[in-house]
Amino acid sequence: MRFLLLLAISITYASALSCPEVTLSQRPKHCKKECIADEDCKRNKRCMCDGECGLSCVNPIAMCHPLPNIENGFIRTAGDLRFGSNAEYGCNKGYILVGASQRRCQANKEWSSSQPVCRLQLKCGPPPEIPFAVHDGSSFSGEYDLDAEVAYNCIPGYHKFNAKGLSISKCLLNRKNVAQWFGPDLRCKARACPDPGDIENGLREGDTFEYPHHVKYSCNPGFLLVGSTSRQCSSNGEWTNEPANCKATECSRPSSPLHGKVVGSSLTYQSVVTYSCDHGYRLVGQVQRICLAEGIWGGNEPRCEEIRCSVLPTLPNGYIEGSETSFGAVAVFRCLETMTHEGASKAKCMEDGQWSAPIPRCLASCRVPHIQNGKIRDKSEGQLIASGSKVIVECNKQHEANIDERLICSNSTWSHVPVCSPLSCHNWPPRVPHARILFSKSSHGSIAKYECNNGYHPNRNNQIIKCLYGEWTKDGPPMKCLPSWCEHPSKTYGTLPGGQILLEGILGAYEFQSYIQKVEEGRAISFQCGKGNYLIGPPKATCVNGEWMPKVSPKCVSQTHPMIEGKILWDRKKRSLPGRAVREYVDDELSTHRQHSGKCGIVSGKLERMIMQHSDNGVSVC
């Protein structure tokens, strides 16, 4: 498919170059739509040359029908029978072709012309063609009678190569009684010209010295060709035109620019000239130019223009003496009274068109500001201070500057104006043993609070300390954190009838004796009831910050059990019932007996009870 596409493209390109222009009236009826380019055609059609139809919209893969054989002849075709394919006809010996010798597959899928025929040759056809020669035959039909002769001669520019060769051809019958041309054996050869020679300081192109070939001449860089650039070997064996020569290139002498000059003595190829300007002028353009191979100076001619500096801007808080801007002019800068001059005092217009220095600054003075709770050292309020000067702020006693104490005057504006504020506390508040300090800032007026660690309590209610003018200050006696002790628990809970209070230690719990008056922070006591009693309230208490917690007083209450209807049969393996079975007999309304058993849980029957273990010597109903 790719091959067919390339074939179609090549055919289209060739068609556009060689296709005849056909008017609408000249186009045969079988022609397809006329076009100029592929865009004029639809679908898979392309704009291609269709013989006598000219450029037409055709299907490049259209196929023509196979050609029938020609009697006493043959047909040669190249490739398949697609559009544009040619069929060439020929006859066997003794026969001559009558009709078109070639036919072409057209866009309408038909072959051009009609089929030719081969008939017995009784006359000679056209005389044979001899390269670079012509004959004097004059038959308009292209057929010659027997014994007809034609003479050959070489065309101009060619000569007879074989001097003894026969230059005549004659129509005779061959052994098969078929008319045939015999002769000539003429050979024509192009006439030769003598060697044209080389060109000095140049190059010759072309090494064939025969008619009708050419030789071309060119010169080396720095030389110009004088004469014709080419010569042709003519039909008479001589070269046309006169020999050319290469002459060294020379540029014309350049003129000096106005207010300047040009330096350089040589004007030959690749010579260089240099331009310069008079004092007070500067060169605009190239400093140097070179003589090119074409005999002209490279680049454009420069010019000299007067050197001028830009007009200086106005000087705020000052003035400029001198208004000239030409080369060498001087401008003097002056500031008004009380202004500070910062920068150059004058500037000169230089050769590069720039001033030697930028304009200065005339800076206004600053007035000494009012400083609350302070002053400016060695200066009085409202006094003028020159721009660029530095002053120092001094704060009153027990005050400090909130930012840098050094002020700089810059063109009537101070770099900053600090505020003298009461001193901050730069040290931590005094440390108190067994306490921690809570505070977020240490500026004047800030407060800090003490909190005693666990097991300690403050010696006073006010636990606050305040920062005043750089010192941490507090009212009353010094803050202390004292150890916390709990008194005998009887003072909190009283006695525990039916039980006892135990003091817990590392090795266990023992009875809290009356002689123990204080217990340290974190110690614990437990409450325990005697047999037949159970505890109501907290089982333990802990000494926290000098108090027993929780403060709820426990009680020991004697145990009672409700009567259970029926009979309880004990499991005699053990007296207690920790998870053991118990059997209950319950009388129902029908005076029948049912036996139930189970662990502490629901016993089903007419009377429902929950039996649970409670003590070593009894059960109770839940």
From Swiss-Prot:
InterPro entries according to UniProt: Compl-Cell_Adhes-Reg, Elafin-like_sf, Sushi/SCR/CCP_sf, Sushi_SCR_CCP_dom, WAP_dom
GO cellular component: extracellular space; synapse
Disulfide cross-links: C19-C49, C35-C47, C41-C57, C64-C105, C91-C118, C124-C171, C154-C188, C193-C233, C219-C246, C251-C291, C277-C304, C309-C349, C335-C362, C366-C409, C395-C420, C425-C467, C452-C481, C486-C543, C529-C556
GO molecular function: peptidase inhibitor activity
Keywords, alphabetical: Disulfide bond, Glycoprotein, Repeat, Secreted, Signal, Sushi, Synapse
Function recorded in the entry: Scaffolding protein that is necessary to cluster acetylcholine receptors at neuromuscular junctions.
Protein name: Protein lev-9
Organism of this sequence: Caenorhabditis elegans
